[in-house]
Swiss-Prot record:
Protein name per UniProt: 4-hydroxy-2-oxovalerate aldolase
Keyword list, A-Z: Aromatic hydrocarbons catabolism, Lyase, Manganese, Metal-binding
Class of this enzyme: lyase
UniProt organism field: Spirochaeta aurantia
Residues binding substrate, per UniProt: R17, D18, S172, H199
MF GO annotations: 2-isopropylmalate synthase activity; 4-hydroxy-2-oxovalerate aldolase activity; manganese ion binding
Start and end residues of each Pyruvate carboxyltransferase domain: 9-260
Length: 341
């Protein structure tokens, strides 16, 4: 079965980027090569590849990747012919000269330049460079729940002014309910003259429902990952997303049978542990803390005899964001100290 009409919604498959969080950034070149062939066969429009935190993020602080950026991108490029190769770029991790230029030289087609939801200013140079090189470039606002709707709209306007061709909001901690998504996507549609996209996490079990709410509110770019493979409780499951959109009559251009096959294959290859909405995932969603914190929080809390739920709620009170993993140990020590008094 195929959904071959002109896509009404363009889906980005983040399996090989967000999914890297689920395996501590240890996806191998062979995993990337094999999965890209399946995604290509399913006619997935955009396949995003890289370290979980994006280009040049491999580090002791957020996790060392099994493969270099160059190896990951070269491998993917070799196997993607019609599907476009995408990357996630956070200024601060990736510089234009040292990281972005070499990535584009390797054949990247789509660049998603991301910032915290109130810091769009840092994306200007990266977005401008991508536009100058003739690449498709989207602006991304991470942890979007941390900004009020008017602030989110103002940040989106900046991305548009810098040259972004669309603005994608990320529910990085999986905290949204469908009404939250509808309000934000609708407001963005009214505020900017470019496309709006949405990236879901499943911490409260709402990834598919939230993605559909985004589309109904006018989003034209939606992210998903095979088997929901991603940080924390995972992302919107790509196969389910395609099936539901087919049921709704929304064209994606993705072959349903082949994406189902891709899911079966990925589960035998590298999705060794299927995403589950566990207790900590729910707490992550409620506290509004980045899903990727789940593993380090659990590990550090366990090592120190501290309840990881307390750690999440304290991180939420401190408005911790991705890249601030060093806060976890600080919070754990503080909670442990209070408990010993």
């Amino acid at each position: 079965m195929s959904n071959s009409n002109r896509p009404a919604v363009v889906i980005t498959d983040s399996t090989l980027r967000d999914g890297n969080h689920a395996v501590s950034h240890q996806l191998r070149a062979s995993d990337i090569a094999s999965y890209c062939q399946w995604a290509e066969a399913a006619h997935v429009p955009i396949v995003e590849v890289g370290h979980g935190n994006g280009l040049a993020a491999s580090s002791l602080q957020v996790g060392l990747a099994a493969c270099s950026d160059q190896m990951m991108l070269e491998t993917a490029r070799m196997h993607l012919k019609t599907s476009r190769l995408g990357i996630h770029v956070i200024p601060g991790f990736a510089t234009v000269a040292k990281d972005l230029k070499p990535a584009l030289d390797l054949g990247v087609d789509v660049v998603r330049v991301a910032s915290h939801c109130t810091e769009a200013d840092i994306t200007e140079r990266h977005i401008g460079y991508c536009r100058d090189q003739g690449k498709t470039v989207f602006g991304v606002l991470m942890m979007s729940h941390m900004a009020e709707v008017p602030v989110l709209c103002e940040e989106a306007k900046k991305l548009e002014a810098y040259g972004a061709e669309a603005v994608i909001i990320m529910d990085s901690s999986g905290t949204y309910l469908p009404l939250d998504v509808t309000r934000r996507v609708s407001a963005l549609k009214e505020s900017i003259g470019i496309g709006v996209g949405f990236h879901a996490h499943n911490n409260l079990g709402m990834a598919i429902a939230n993605s559909i709410a985004a589309i109904e509110a006018g989003a034209v770019l939606i992210d998903g990952s095979i088997r929901g493979f991603g940080a924390g409780a995972g992302n919107a499951q790509l196969e389910t997303l395609v099936a539901v959109l087919e049921r709704l009559g929304v064209a994606t251009g993705i072959d349903l049978y082949r994406v189902l096959d891709a899911g079966d294959f990925a589960e035998t290859l590298f999705v060794k542990e299927l995403p589950v909405v566990r207790s900590l995932s729910i707490v992550s969603g409620l506290s509004g803390v980045f899903s990727g914190f789940s593993k380090p929080v659990l590990r550090i809390a366990s090592e120190n005899g501290v309840d990881p739920r307390d750690v999440f709620f304290e991180l939420g009170r401190r408005r911790a964001v991705a890249g601030q993993e060093d806060l976890i140990l600080e919070v754990v020590k503080e909670i442990k100290s209070r408990g010993n008094r």
